Amino acid sequence: MARQSFKRRKFCRFTAEKIQEVDYKQVDLLKDFISENGKIIPARITGTKAFYQRQLAVAVKRARFLALLPYTDQHK
């Protein structure tokens, strides 16, 4: 049996919105790229280009260090 899967076209949100640089102070933007557990979602899932994925990782790590974002989930 052949397995059919629907693949949606992935696009880089940063190039679509013409964002030049990812900043750690944009917490609402960063939350879109973090899973429920607090992990950074990989580029193969989000469709982000490698250049922006590196900036995103650095920005998330800085925001975590400054307590703008949590390191893990809420542990409910």
UniProtKB/Swiss-Prot annotation:
Gene Ontology MF terms: small ribosomal subunit rRNA binding; structural constituent of ribosome
InterPro entries, per the entry: Ribosomal_bS18 (IPR001648), Ribosomal_bS18_CS (IPR018275), Ribosomal_bS18_sf (IPR036870)
Gene3D superfamilies found in the cross-reference section: Ribosomal protein S18
Pfam family of the protein (one): Ribosomal_S18
Protein's GO biological process: translation
A cellular component term, taken from the record's GO annotations: cytosolic small ribosomal subunit
UniProt KW keywords: Ribonucleoprotein, Ribosomal protein, RNA-binding, rRNA-binding
NCBIfam families referenced in this protein's UniProt entry, alphabetically: S18
Subunit structure: Part of the 30S ribosomal subunit. Forms a tight heterodimer with protein bS6.
Function comment: Binds as a heterodimer with protein bS6 to the central domain of the 16S rRNA, where it helps stabilize the platform of the 30S subunit.
PANTHER family xrefs: 30S RIBOSOMAL PROTEIN S18, SMALL RIBOSOMAL SUBUNIT PROTEIN BS18M
Similarity-based family: Belongs to the bacterial ribosomal protein bS18 family.
This protein's name: Small ribosomal subunit protein bS18
Organism in which the protein naturally occurs: Neisseria meningitidis serogroup B (strain ATCC BAA-335 / MC58)
Gene label: rpsR
